[in-house]
Amino acid sequence: MFFFSQPELNAIYLSLKVATIAILFALPVAIFIAWILSRKQFWGKQLLNGIVHLPLVLPPVVIGYLLLIVMAKRGAIGQYLWEWFGFSFSFSWRGAVLSSAVMAFPLMVRSIKQAFDAIDPKLEQAARTLGASPLKVFFTLNLPLSFSGVIAGAVLGFARSLGEFGATITFVSNIPNQTQTIPAALFTFIETPDGELAAARLCAIAIVISLIALSASEWLAERQKRYAK
């Protein structure tokens, strides 16, 4: 397609596939955790908040290593997934999805939590006074009012997933057509003789996609602020 080589197209396609699936699976969990952190008071809340945000402060290689010892074929959990279901994250695009979801998760939670925090608790109290159940309040009040924040979190997570490298290459290596996303392919081309042009093209694609995602996220965040007022 145009001036992209097949390996470049494969990396772009795999990156979009991995990022999309990662966000689809991580978003419901991020919404739930963000709601808990925003609306509930319980012992261990700060601990949960710290665990959620660990991927923001730990080196990605450390996250990749933790995934390796927990979710690989011989990992603490991964071995049972393999023995019972024949399912493995090791050396496959599924592992890239998992590592991308983990790295994007705290950004999604932060954005969605801010949206929940902006909702006036008095609205929820009024809804409960009128007989609405907590579940109905969540789906008819909390979620619609925080929708822009949820989408902004998803967009930020998508951008972070596209840029994920350290955790992915540590967990599932750098295998063409399997785990070689844009950052991994860029790394490979940089180390390959005469790979400068391919690296530059992938770099340009990554910048364009990231700018679009960040612009969309900022626009949605501003919209959420105006709507909250």
Residues covered by each model-derived region:
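Interhelical loop and adjacent transmembrane-helix boundary motif
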Residues: 1-10, 169-211, 216
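Membrane-interfacial helix termini and adjacent extracytoplasmic/periplasmic loops
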Residues: 3, 64-101, 171-175
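Alpha-helical transmembrane segments of multi-pass membrane proteins
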Residues: 13-21, 55, 59, 135, ...
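Hydrophobic positions within alpha-helical transmembrane segments of bacterial inner-membrane proteins
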Residues: 19, 23-31, 35, 61, ...
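Transmembrane-helix boundary motif in ABC transporter permease subunits
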Residues: 21-52, 65-67, 115-117, 122, ...
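Transmembrane alpha-helices
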Residues: 24, 109-112, 116, 120, ...
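C-terminal transmembrane helix and the adjacent membrane-cytosol boundary/short C-terminal tail
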Residues: 44, 113-124, 128-129, 199-229
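Non-cytoplasmic
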Residues: 72-74, 150-188
